[in-house]
């Protein structure tokens, strides 16, 4: 059996990569959305690792719900980005300040 620390290190690396992607790339909204999803997957990895370590299944069930909500969030976010691209011709963050709401 793989020790818990290895899974936590993998989760921390994935979370760090997602966070670094957000910090480095602040222009493209699709890349920002992908980095946020990577961070969510890192958190899910930690939930699964702790669930296996403690012998409880609550963490795995929680991950299932997180993945469901994340899929819905991604679908809605991509739909908004497609509409924004059709209207403005760009998906840069700098162009988002012209949105009315």
Swiss-Prot record:
One of its GO terms (biological process) is ATP synthesis coupled electron transport. It is found in: Cell inner membrane. Belongs to the complex I subunit 4L family. This is NADH-quinone oxidoreductase subunit K. PANTHER family: NADH DEHYDROGENASE SUBUNIT 4L-RELATED, NADH-UBIQUINONE OXIDOREDUCTASE SUBUNIT ND4L. GO terms for cellular component: NADH dehydrogenase complex; plasma membrane. One of its GO terms (molecular function) is quinone binding. It is an enzyme of class 7 (translocase). It catalyses: a quinone + NADH + 5 H(+)(in) = a quinol + NAD(+) + 4 H(+)(out).
């Amino acid at each position: 059996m793989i020790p818990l620390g290895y899974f936590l290190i993998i989760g921390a690396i994935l979370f760090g990569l997602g966070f670094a992607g957000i910090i480095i790339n602040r222009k493209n909204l699709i890349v920002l959305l992908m980095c946020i999803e990577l961070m969510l997957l890192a958190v899910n990895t930690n939930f699964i690792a702790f669930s296996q370590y403690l012998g409880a299944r609550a963490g795995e069930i929680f991950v299932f719900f997180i993945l469901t909500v994340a899929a819905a969030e991604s679908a809605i976010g991509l739909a908004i980005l497609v509409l924004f691209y059709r209207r403005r011709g760009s998906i840069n963050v700098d162009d988002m300040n012209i949105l009315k709401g």
